Design a protein with these regions (language model features):
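Patatin-like phospholipase
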Residues: 1-38, 46-283
Length: 283
């Protein structure tokens, strides 16, 4: 039914996408040709395609147990990262993406991971600070579905195609870069060039499906925040959570919020299916 899918970024809110996709995909027999994801949405698009949603959620929720802080001061004093979420994310990616699973994904669809390239000759710490600051400010003031501040600053969009990943390490580097939000997540390096969170250019990179839409092929964009209005673009459908998801993007101590996001995705997926059935009956 949909030839292209977009998984927007959103950190832990992206577990909503897992619940929605797992509910809707079997009923609609979704077999998209191209799937694009940014930040944690890029991970969500891949583990849902592999049918590993339950495993990922349980592993993450288990890792949250017993944690009272987002920071690891003891590890930091010994030379580790202050925010352990980045190392935890990398460890999970290394466990998930074997050579066999990469081959499975490459044979299934044209998956693309969105990253942002900072302006050339900018020191990376400056680029990260300005890019993330501009993104957050625009989000708070304008609440756009598609951000524009990053492009105006000179950030460039880039896509890493899974078919060009020769080994799991290439995919893991792309996923880490797509979620790169210092100091929470480390800066990325892809193709010997610096890379930051794909959401700094556009958190919902539907631009990567524009050629399909222009050719008359329908696409579906999975957002991770409730929105009151979306752009009206031919052949594009947006879906979003029906309420605010009570979990912060990078938290590693809120398993209840992660489960809530997933369960809300299931409910919203069922509501979406009912709306499609109602439209079909009205025709």
């Amino acid at each position: 039914m949909y030839a292209g899918l977009v998984f927007a970024g959103g950190g832990n809110r992206c577990y909503w996408q897992g619940g929605f996709y797992e509910t809707v995909a079997p009923r609609l027999d979704l077999k998209p040709k191209r799937v694009v994801g940014a930040s944690a949405g890029a991970l969500a698009m891949l583990y849902t395609a592999l049918g590993l949603g339950h495993y990922v959620r349980e592993r993450v929720c288990e890792a949250c147990l017993g944690r009272s802080s987002e920071m690891d001061w003891a590890g930091f004093r010994q030379g580790g990262r202050l925010f352990p979420v980045g190392d935890m994310y990398h460890l999970m990616l290394t466990d998930l993406f074997t050579r066999e699973r990469l081959a499975t994904l490459q044979a299934q669809a044209d998956f693309r991971v969105a990253i942002s390239r900072p302006p050339r000759f900018w020191p990376l710490p400056v680029a990260a600070l300005l890019g993330i600051g501009a993104y957050q400010l625009e989000k708070r003031l304008r609440k756009p579905v598609h951000a524009t501040a990053g492009r105006r600053l000179g950030f460039k969009p880039d896509l890493i195609r899974l078919e060009n990943c020769a080994a799991p390490d290439d995919l893991i580097a792309a996923l880490m870069a797509s979620a790169s939000v210092p100091p929470f997540m480390p800066a990325g390096l892809v193709g010997q060039r610096a890379a930051l969170d794909g959401g700094l250019v556009d958190n919902a990179p539907a631009w990567a499906l524009a050629d399909m839409e222009a050719a008359g092929e329908p696409t579906l964009v999975l957002l991770t925040r409730p929105v009151s209005a979306v752009p009206q673009i031919a052949n594009r459908t947006y879906v979003s959570p029906s309420q605010v998801i009570p979990v912060s993007q990078f938290t590693i101590r809120n398993p209840e919020g992660i489960r809530f996001a997933y369960e809300l995705g299931i409910r919203d997926g069922e509501a979406f299916l009912r709306s499609l059935e109602a439209k079909a009956r009205a025709v």
